From Swiss-Prot:
Biological process terms in GO annotation: negative regulation of DNA-templated transcription
Keywords in alphabetical order: ATP-binding, DNA-binding, Metal-binding, Nucleotide-binding, Repressor, Transcription, Transcription regulation, Zinc, Zinc-finger
Zn finger (unnamed) location: 3-34
Alphabetized InterPro entries for the sequence: ATP-cone_dom, NrdR-like_N, RNR_NrdR-like
Protein source organism: Geobacter sulfurreducens (strain ATCC 51573 / DSM 12127 / PCA)
Function statement: Negatively regulates transcription of bacterial ribonucleotide reductase nrd genes and operons by binding to NrdR-boxes.
Family assignment from sequence similarity: Belongs to the NrdR family.
Descriptive protein name: Transcriptional repressor NrdR
Molecular functions per Gene Ontology: ATP binding; double-stranded DNA binding; zinc ion binding
Keyword Cell wall biogenesis/degradation on entry: no
Amino acid sequence: MKCPFCGQLDSKVVDSRPDKGGAAIRRRRECESCGKRFTTHERIEEVLPLVLKKDGRREPFDRLKLIAGIQKACEKRQVSRETIERLVDRLEARLPELGEKEVPSTTIGEWVMTELHDIDEVAYVRFASVYRSFKDVNEFMSELQDLLKK
């Protein structure tokens, strides 16, 4: 494993334990060159369905892209990185359960909105404003009205 501090490839594992939820292994490593320690996470590489975009393109599911989009919606909100990671873990676990080779991006977007609604309503509205591409203020206000009714 390449050391993030000095770039050398030799490191040794000094501690290894299951991550929360057991979906990954957290490893504490020590660089044999500079002696600094760093953490890595190892997870099973699953074959996930392709994401079918609104314009018809297909692309591989990108966990980091999804995390980045959710983080943007949660900016300056009391939503931790860990909460976002768990949200994406739940969504990622649902993908193989569909049993499909492709999943529409709209399905993933709706799942994110459902999760965000329960976590932080402001983040939900921010995500919805980008995801739903509101045409005007009236559409945006309609979404807010629906949120207030719930």
